[in-house]
């Protein structure tokens, strides 16, 4: 794992700062843009090997839009994933960045936006994902690696809560390894599994 890298802020050098355009309704019921910005809750991760930007979060599913309940919730930094909610997180990976094997107890839908990344599963199976490719991670132990030693990569993850995951009669555990320290200051989103 690369524990240091060239990333000192989001976005990573060489990648554009994405805009988000949040819609809603005005007092007359017309569809309008209610917020245009670059996202909330940015953080450098793993000593500069990656950086994240929380694009959206909501504390319920179905999502409560009336009265902008979701936008009020999103003002607070979310947990890794949100029980009964949704979190959309963009992560930039430094050149050569490689995570440890990890499992979050959520459905992780990951879309490659920039660059090329390798997804390795706990079984050792691997796939290369390119811009536009999507991984649907259903609680699998996995690892990400930016295949380039020269350019950053970017992924967009939508994280949804799941019911307890039982495989071969055994309930699978949350296991983020050393990545958990990146989320330790977050709230109680992952239950009793905290950084050691």
Swiss-Prot record:
Q: Where is the Cupin type-2 domain?
A: 92-156
Q: What induces it?
A: Expression is up-regulated during sexual development. Expression is also up-regulated during confrontation with the arthropod fungivore Drosophila melanogaster.
Q: Which InterPro entries match?
A: Cupin_2, OryJ/VirC-like, RmlC-like_jellyroll, RmlC_Cupin_sf
Q: What is its EC number?
A: 1.-.-.-
Q: Which UniProt keywords apply?
A: Oxidoreductase
Q: What does this protein do?
A: Cupin-domain-containing oxidoreductase; part of the gene cluster that mediates the biosynthesis of sordarial, a salicylic aldehyde structurally related to the phytotoxin pyriculol. The most interesting aspect of this pathway is formation of an aromatic product from the highly reducing polyketide synthase srdA. SrdA synthesizes a reduced polyketide chain from one molecule of acetyl-CoA and five molecules of malonyl-CoA. The polyketide chain is then reductively released as an aldehyde.
The name this protein goes by in its record: Cupin-domain-containing oxidoreductase srdB
Upper classification of the source organism reads:
Eukaryota, Fungi, Dikarya, Ascomycota, Pezizomycotina
């Amino acid at each position: 794992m690369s524990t240091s890298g060239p990333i000192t802020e989001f976005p990573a050098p060489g990648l554009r700062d994405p805009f988000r355009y949040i819609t809603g309704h005005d007092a007359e019921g017309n569809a309008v843009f209610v917020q245009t910005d670059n996202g909330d809750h940015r953080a450098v991760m793993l000593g500069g090997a990656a950086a994240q930007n929380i694009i959206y979060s909501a504390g319920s599913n179905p999502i409560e839009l009336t009265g902008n309940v979701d936008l009020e919730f999103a003002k607070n930094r979310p947990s890794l994933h949100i029980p009964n909610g949704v979190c959309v997180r963009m992560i930039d990976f430094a050149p050569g960045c490689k995570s440890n094997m990890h499992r979050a107890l959520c459905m992780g839908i990951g879309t490659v936006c920039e660059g090329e990344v390798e997804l390795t599963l706990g079984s050792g199976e691997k796939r290369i994902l390119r811009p536009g490719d999507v991984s649907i991670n259903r609680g699998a132990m996995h690892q990400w690696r930016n295949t380039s030693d020269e350019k950053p990569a970017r992924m967009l993850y939508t994280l949804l809560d799941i019911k307890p995951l039982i495989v071969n009669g055994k309930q699978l555990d949350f296991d983020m390894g050393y990545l958990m320290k990146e989320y330790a200051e977050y709230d109680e989103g992952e239950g009793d599994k905290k950084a050691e």
